[in-house]
Amino acid sequence: MLFVSLCKARAGTPKENIARRAQWQYPEGTQPVAEYWLQTTDPTVIVISEADSIAPMMSAVADWDDVFEFTVVPAIAAEEGLELAKQMMQG
C-alpha cells in the first residue's frame, strides 16, 4: 500500500534537520518510493512510501513530530486508479 506524507516544518533550522535526516533510517517494513525536499514551508517535504500497514508510518511520525506537522494519506498510482474506475463502470 502506498502512503503519501506531507510534512510541514515546525521547528529547528534546516542545517539541524538535514544533519538529523542524514542519520535517520526509515522504519522497518517501510519501502521509500520518493522523498522530495521543497522550497516552500507547507509542505516542506513530501514522502511517498510503501508499507503493508499504517504502523511504520506512525513510527516515522513519532520520530519526527517535533520537527514536522504531518498529513499521511493512503494513495494509489494513476494507472491503478484508472483500472479501478473501469471496473466500477462495468459493474
How would you describe each model-predicted region?
Residues 1-91:
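Conserved, structured core segments of small domains
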